[in-house]
Amino acid sequence: MSVDIRPTPPAQDSARQNVTLQIVSVVMFTFIGYLTIGIPLAVLPGYVHDDLGYGSVLAGLVISLQYLATLLARPYAGRVIDGLGPKRAVLYGMAGSAASGLFMLLSVAIQGWPALSLASLLVGRLVLGAAESLVGSAAIGWGIGRVGAPHTAKVISWNGIASYGAIALGAPLGVLLVQWLGLWSMGASIVLLGALGFALAWPKLPAPLVHGERLPFHHVLGRVTPHGMGLALGAIGFGTIATFITLYYASRGWANAVLCLSAFGGCFIGARLLFANSINRLGGFRVAIICLGVESLGLLLLWSAPNPWVGLAGAALTGFGFSLVFPAFGVEAVNLVPASNRGAALGAYSLFVDLSLGITGPLVGFVANLFGFRSMFLFACLASLGGLALAVALHRRSRRPG
């Protein structure tokens, strides 16, 4: 007589809730870290252009410099995560976020000397970019260390919800803080958030260090490059909407472009909450193929939209499709390296989304100058289809024996 020892559905529900709580308790550091990124996002260009009196090029440089710093710091972040542990990396990142807030406070204090004020601001942006490279990847590594590798997709999905949600909340929060309290409140809030994150991380139990061979970063980068390229091609659609949707709507004489950003963000988060487990069931490549197909359809709707409501539907579909592209390719990428190199793999893989978002603005802007604003979304659709084709090729390669 056999005895069924499988857990009952309530026990399974309890186990799932426990895993989710453990993940959320760690990815909250990503939320705090990205909140420090979102708060100055909508304020700094105006501060540099209007208050310090510099041109639009420098105003844009202040924003993009942070992404460049994140890109360059990825290899170092991977070494810290793998060598010292994710908790230590989070602590370093939170300290860096607080330090960047101090540089922003200094910039406001010496506003009467525009060159010095700008220099202080630029240093702060570099420090914040380096801090971002530590916190985001470390939170994923910490979460996987706590709940186990089988839940990698769920950890990455929740981490993405935390990062995108924090930026969406931080940007309007920064505007309100400056309107109510003045420019100093922007730097002060970042200092306080960094200190809060440090204080919350300090007493938490670290994830156990995984011992083993540490591969050189360029070896890890070579292994994850095909997956990163698929991610980069998919991210062009997101970058195009985030950067140019307001100009596109204005060129068509349509109002309420901000609704597209809300629809994109809402569907992005909703899909991650509802379908994160599909990666474990179907595999990363299958999910990437489906998601990039949906994203391509959304971008095609934006390109061909006869009215703003079709454009809104296109933005929603694009957000829904892009939602699982990062974790879908990411799960397959992380599986290519030993567990002792997980941090390096996450850093190398994330580098591609930094690169994609960094070049999307000028590249898609060039396309718009040549062919008009509508053409941007056709270009992004073709890029997404390129990512889909790459996912199909990787899936076929993974099924070959040996």
Curated annotation (Swiss-Prot):
It is found in: Cell inner membrane. It comes from the Bacteria. It is a multi-pass membrane protein. The keyword Transmembrane helix applies. GO terms for molecular function: transmembrane transporter activity. PROSITE patterns: MFS. InterPro entries: MFS, MFS_dom, MFS_trans_sf, MFS_Transporters, MFS_YhhS-like. The chain crosses the membrane at residues 23-43, 52-72, 90-110, 121-141, 158-178, 180-200, 228-248, 255-275, 282-302, 309-329, 351-371, 375-395. GO terms for cellular component: plasma membrane. The keyword Methyltransferase does not apply. Disulfide bonds: none annotated. Gene3D superfamilies: MFS general substrate transporter like domains. Keywords: Cell inner membrane, Cell membrane, Membrane, Transmembrane, Transmembrane helix, Transport. Belongs to the major facilitator superfamily. YhhS family. NCBIfam families: PRK05122.1, PRK12382.1. PANTHER family: MAJOR FACILITATOR SUPERFAMILY MFS_1, RESISTANCE PROTEIN MDTM, PUTATIVE-RELATED-RELATED. This is Uncharacterized MFS-type transporter PA1993. The lineage of its organism: Bacteria, Pseudomonadati, Pseudomonadota, Gammaproteobacteria, Pseudomonadales.
